[in-house]
Amino acid sequence: MAKNTKLWGGRFEGTVEDWVERFGASISFDQKLAKFDVIGSLAHVQMLGQTGILSLEESEKIQVGLKELLEELEAGQLDFDIANEDIHMNMEVLLTEKIGPLAGKLHTARSRNDQVATDMHLYLKEQLGYVLDKLAHLKGVLLDLAENHVATIMPGYTHLQHAQPISFAHHLMAYYNMFQRDSERFEFNQKHTDLCPLGAAALAGTTFPIDRQLSSDLLEFKQPYTNSLDAVSDRDFILEFLSNASILMMHMSRFCEEMINWCSFEYQFITLSDTFTIGSSIMPQKKNPDMAELIRGKTGRVYGHLFGLLTVMKSLPLAYNKDLQEDKEGMFDTVETILNSLDVLAGMLSSLQVNKEKMQESTEKDFSNATELADYLAGKGLPFREAHEVVGRLVLDSIKSAKNLQDWTLEELQTYHSLITEDIYVYLQPKTAVQRRNSLGGTGFDQVEYQIAVAKKANEAKK
């Protein structure tokens, strides 16, 4: 029987069949962790040298070899072998080829269990910084757009029906606030990613006199995990990221859904740049909002990664199980998806054309000013419920007569209630309706300008 040549093969008599090897290998995707695997190893071997577990000479030689591997990796000169299963074994084999048997001492006081957890913490910690940078850019684009459209009036909707006229900037600031909370969630995610698993070993720690705080400091983590079982067995920091990413994608998807509607012939509220639209292979006139549709579609993809990992984790006993190999691809794909989606959405918003006249016109052909009349009557002392009923009858009669509220004469309006006077026509104007809603957080122009000013100050403080 052929000898098992795996680095862990001493206990085995038989060899692994090629097809089984392919099924179990993860190098096709976990090579994304290569840089972080080397960085983690550099910190580990430096700690081994400083604590006397390895001699300083041994530590230095291993560090030189690892740094050479890092240079070759960055130059695209490393080749990985599926026979070595994963990025950790591949790197150890490559290091052995470079410096000989001394490479075997690198794994002293370390397991692949704490090694892979460390790699993923390092990877996600870096990526969260990129996500937050792109979110900050998107929020800046939104603020610039909102600042230019405080006085642009559009219909506000409930149930996709015209409800009340609002400032377009007010609508944009609603999304700004959603994205701001997304930023805060990712910032909190950073706290849980900023923990160092290195030194937890397989599950129970190690008998070697390691210095876990030193390893943590060298890798610029805030602190080590305080429980070795927890360090190697949980992936809640990834689940938290996937959850936050799902909420972010949901917010982007809702925004894209609205832009898809707004650029349709029925709305014509906005015109998207050619850069973010696609033509039809058969219909020459088409200009389809494909990029917005793709963000909307990719939202389901990110949801899938969240539920996939939740399902992987739901029945896992402590500590490490091979199921955890399935924690990586969804994380990698989600990172790529949200970074690209943030870029595309920011690009669409910074280049879109707002058709102010269409938005304004849409508020003049509906009954979204009906609440103004009800508030007007309530302000004159009529109980709001009674005012609501009066205006409801007027709206019904207006529909039957093909009129808008402002089309009725004063005498006709007064047949509905004597409290209505000449000044009602000012109140029924969409601009007045918007301007008067100056309660905190409302759509009144002063309030919207205040919201923008506060948001810009907060955004600047983050830079």
UniProtKB/Swiss-Prot annotation:
Catalytic activity from the UniProt record: 2-(N(omega)-L-arginino)succinate = fumarate + L-arginine
GO biological process: arginine biosynthetic process via ornithine; L-arginine biosynthetic process
PROSITE patterns documented for this protein: FUMARATE_LYASES (PS00163)
Pathway involvement of the protein, from the record: Amino-acid biosynthesis; L-arginine biosynthesis; L-arginine from L-ornithine and carbamoyl phosphate: step 3/3
EC number, as in UniProt: 4.3.2.1
Cellular localisation: Cytoplasm
UniProt KW S-adenosyl-L-methionine keyword: no
Family per record: Belongs to the lyase 1 family. Argininosuccinate lyase subfamily.
This protein's name: Argininosuccinate lyase
Lineage: Bacteria, Bacillati, Bacillota, Bacilli, Lactobacillales
